[in-house]
UniProtKB/Swiss-Prot annotation:
ApaG domain segment(s): 3-127
NCBIfam families linked to this entry: PRK05461.1 (NF003967)
Database matches in HAMAP family: ApaG
Record-level GO BP terms: error-free translesion synthesis
Protein name (record): Protein ApaG
Matches recorded under Pfam families: DUF525
Lineage: Bacteria, Pseudomonadati, Pseudomonadota, Alphaproteobacteria, Hyphomicrobiales
Amino acid sequence: MYRAVTRHIEVTVEPNFLPEKSSVADGRWFWSYTVVITNSGAETVQLRSRHWVITDGAGRQQEVRGEGVVGEQPVLAPGERFEYTSGVPLSTASGFMSGSYQMESASGEQFDIVVPAFSLDSPDGKRVLN
């Protein structure tokens, strides 16, 4: 599990390779990832938007920006958490993702929280140690 905390908001990510949705012959690998956002702060916050940087095993990057996550802009009171699962395809057997969520406090302040960088590994990926 990967973890980051920004302003008392914890984000954890657990990636999972999905062989049933992947095809080595077609050059397609697919992962799901489950994100849990926990508000340990004293103020209610709302997730407004997301920003992802997806990097495949060849170093090609794709940026994704959009409102909310999985069609929602969850509101998290102190002590509450929100969990969702999404997916990502790559044209290589490995890669990684990183990003941020734009949050808004009950007082209207907007700020970014870190989504920890996480590795997308498949059994077909070659591990290289530098």
